[in-house]
């Protein structure tokens, strides 16, 4: 009888422990995403962790002129290969020196255009931001969300610059404004168009300026 009571008490405590664990698991709240993370996630940011290499060609057409350069980036090792018709340069972003700084500046610029939604997460400690709703987008004139980020005045290749992102309730960017040194007037306004999904990454491959013979776009985008 004594052994039976001991077994019964042990079983009761075991069941209570299981019930308590289940309650803890159920009651654990999910982390609420901030606006930066919501925009990044809307563009497939959750799949970035699976990317081992990214190759793309950055193109600019202005009037009759054309400019392009190609990059191959291995984000886990941070090795970058820069390719043009004239030259090929390989360097590592963990060890940028005076010789590779200019090349790295070009890479940072081109990568920012390609992966700006992800930069909201990667760079969030380096800028301040403000989010508002029902703001008129500069190109379409539609009412959208507006997210303004202003980079710190120190560090990076373009300190103090500001960007205004415009998007709908799906958090997918439709337009943006670049304001150099956080000046009030826009330095550049472009659309975000021709989204393509590559290995779960949703990337805008075309940016056009209204009423201007200018387009910035990406070709040969490969994600592995």
Predicted regions and their residues:
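Sec-dependent signal peptide recognition
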Residues: 2-8
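C-terminal motif of bacterial Sec signal peptides marking the signal peptidase cleavage site
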Residues: 14-17
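N-terminal mature ectodomain segment of secretory-pathway/periplasmic proteins
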Residues: 27, 32-101, 126-127, 131-136
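Flexible, processing/modification-adjacent segments and terminal tails
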Residues: 91-161, 183
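Gly/Pro-enriched, hydrophobic low-complexity segments
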Residues: 143-224
